[in-house]
Amino acid sequence: MIKLSNITKVFHQGTRTIQALNNVSLHVPAGQIYGVIGASGAGKSTLIRCVNLLERPTEGSVLVDGQELTTLSESELTKARRQIGMIFQHFNLLSSRTVFGNVALPLELDNTPKDEIKRRVTELLSLVGLGDKHDSYPSNLSGGQKQRVAIARALASNPKVLLCDEATSALDPATTRSILELLKDINRRLGLTILLITHEMDVVKRICDCVAVISNGELIEQDTVSEVFSHPKTPLAQKFIQSTLHLDIPEDYQERLQAEPFADCVPMLRLEFTGQSVDAPLLSETARRFNVNNNIISAQMDYAGGVKFGIMLTEMHGTQQDTQAAIAWLQEHHVKVEVLGYV
């Protein structure tokens, strides 16, 4: 449905040249939810704006539904853009128009008959859960409701593709979850292809089928969500995955934790499990093999793309030789082990 090939985008600011994208290629199959994740300034927004040519690539090819957009005339491009809806971090609603009027706007601009506009807008507001807000104004809506109006407006022309530019980053966590569930529901009901960009791995984990990691204008990793969470290939992907798990050292342990070993101490370990290592009984196996005992302090597990992953804080009791051997064995079995200190 979306195929970007060798996209390069260069900006010129006076005598300065800024390369925002460098030889980026990306394929989003029809009906998928595809996420692009990266830090601020990585090139995410430039990339998604190249899909509908809000930013025209310096080099490269942009195919949407089999049509090469970079070769179209302005009138042809305007027509093609009707098949590409877009929502943004800021909702960009017209404050002087009601909810109905905001959603109706693209249909009015397309000279759609009034009866058809009424039918379509009513249908869309019902779809996004705002069937009772026809006559409300944006100033009377919450942030989540405003984004629902923006989604309905983006769907007004029956697009085949929806682009989401940091669409949930201005929302609180509960509202973010509800908007993501709405996007997932729309994807299922309408077969809509969704390309979203974000700096939050929680967004990717919750609704995406595939994910690409962007850094300094280059895609450094892309695969299914389950594969990236199971076997992240780059340090940046690992960092984003770790950001979805939050496990603090309990206060009483922080007070006792020492950086260097001392008499009768035990190491405190942070264990990170991904993919196959999650379900394998590795801790009980280390106890049998190396005569060590693990006292689990706290743990957190989660799912992404059907794959379980998680982290654990544990004290490992045993001789220095046995604990070192057990740690090495865990690492051989795809567990990331960090010695946080000694207690």
Swiss-Prot record:
The keyword ATP-binding applies. It catalyses: L-methionine(out) + ATP + H2O = L-methionine(in) + ADP + phosphate + H(+); D-methionine(out) + ATP + H2O = D-methionine(in) + ADP + phosphate + H(+). It is an enzyme of class 7 (translocase). It is a peripheral membrane protein. ATP binds at residues 38-45. GO terms for cellular component: Gram-negative-bacterium-type cell wall; plasma membrane. Residues 2-241 form the ABC transporter domain. Pfam families: ABC_tran (PF00005), NIL (PF09383). Keywords: Amino-acid transport, ATP-binding, Cell inner membrane, Cell membrane, Membrane, Nucleotide-binding, Translocase, Transport. It is found in: Cell inner membrane. Its EC number is 7.4.2.11. One of its GO terms (molecular function) is ATP hydrolysis activity. PROSITE patterns: ABC_TRANSPORTER_1, ABC_TRANSPORTER_2, METN. PANTHER family: AMINO ACID IMPORT ATP-BINDING PROTEIN, METHIONINE IMPORT ATP-BINDING PROTEIN METN. Part of the ABC transporter complex MetNIQ involved in methionine import. Responsible for energy coupling to the transport system. NCBIfam families: ABC_MetN. Belongs to the ABC transporter superfamily. Methionine importer (TC 3.A.1.24) family. The complex is composed of two ATP-binding proteins (MetN), two transmembrane proteins (MetI) and a solute-binding protein (MetQ). This is Methionine import ATP-binding protein MetN. It comes from Escherichia coli O6:K15:H31 (strain 536 / UPEC). The lineage of its organism: Bacteria, Pseudomonadati, Pseudomonadota, Gammaproteobacteria, Enterobacterales. The gene is metN.
